[in-house]
């Protein structure tokens, strides 16, 4: 790291917006298992990790692309329902390996109302993990994607071209976005029956 008389350059991963070293230090000191949620522009990534001096040990993980490949999910891989399903899937795998409690590691995401990170955590809680998240309000209709279905219905009646443009991925995979809540239930049942 470069040092100057008035300025000290931060660590590379902090400059890149990848690691909050203060929070990481707190997690390492606590020695608790972390429930890590990362949202990218295309996917949701969930990992359950144990702290180890040599490096973190991944107990279980799930990637939202698995929903498409293994469970035939036809929606987007980075929306609210897929965040919930990815969290649920990762938690099922962790529970199988004997994990019962975790702490939420949301990284540099801002803990704001409606953030997809909390829907992934809610999925893990519903799968059987104990994760303290405080008094964050989570709307059950958003978990199923009812807000997406309502918007799609409204847009279809008002502007068909924009509807086809915004929901091209859904339509290309053979799903009408208005049917997303029922498709969500179907995929959730597949995940439950497979056991992760």
From Swiss-Prot:
GO cellular component: cytosolic large ribosomal subunit
Assembly behavior: Part of the 50S ribosomal subunit. Contacts the 5S and 23S rRNAs.
Gene Ontology biological process terms from the UniProt entry: ribosomal large subunit assembly; translation
Pfam assignment, any one: Ribosomal_L5e
NCBIfam families: PRK08569.1
Protein name: Large ribosomal subunit protein uL18
Keywords: Ribonucleoprotein, Ribosomal protein, RNA-binding, rRNA-binding
Upper taxonomic lineage: Archaea, Thermoproteota, Thermoprotei, Sulfolobales, Sulfolobaceae
Span of the signal peptide: none
Family under the similarity heading: Belongs to the universal ribosomal protein uL18 family.
Name of the gene encoding the protein in the UniProt record: rpl18
Job description of the protein: This is one of the proteins that bind and probably mediate the attachment of the 5S RNA into the large ribosomal subunit, where it forms part of the central protuberance.
GO molecular function: 5S rRNA binding; structural constituent of ribosome
């Amino acid at each position: 790291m470069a040092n100057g008389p008035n300025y000290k350059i931060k660590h590379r991963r902090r400059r890149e917006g990848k690691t909050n070293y203060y929070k990481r230090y707190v997690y390492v000191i606590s020695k608790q298992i972390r429930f890590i949620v990362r949202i990218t522009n295309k996917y949701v990534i969930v990992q359950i990790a144990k702290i180890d001096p040599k490096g973190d040990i991944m107990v279980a993980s799930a990637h939202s692309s698995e929903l498409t490949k293994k469970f035939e999910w036809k929606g987007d891989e980075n929306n609210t329902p897929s965040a919930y399903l990815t969290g649920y899937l990762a938690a099922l795998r962790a529970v199988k390996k004997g994990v019962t409690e975790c702490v939420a590691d949301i990284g540099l995401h801002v803990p704001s109302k409606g953030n997809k990170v909390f829907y992934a955590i809610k999925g893990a809680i519903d799968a059987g993990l104990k994760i303290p998240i405080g008094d964050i309000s989570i709307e059950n209709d958003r978990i199923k994607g009812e807000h997406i279905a309502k918007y799609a219905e409204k847009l279809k009646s008002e502007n068909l071209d924009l509807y086809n443009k915004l929901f091209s991925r859904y339509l290309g995979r053979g799903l009408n976005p208005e049917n997303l809540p029922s498709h969500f239930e179907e995929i959730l049942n597949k995940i439950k029956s497979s056991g992760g």
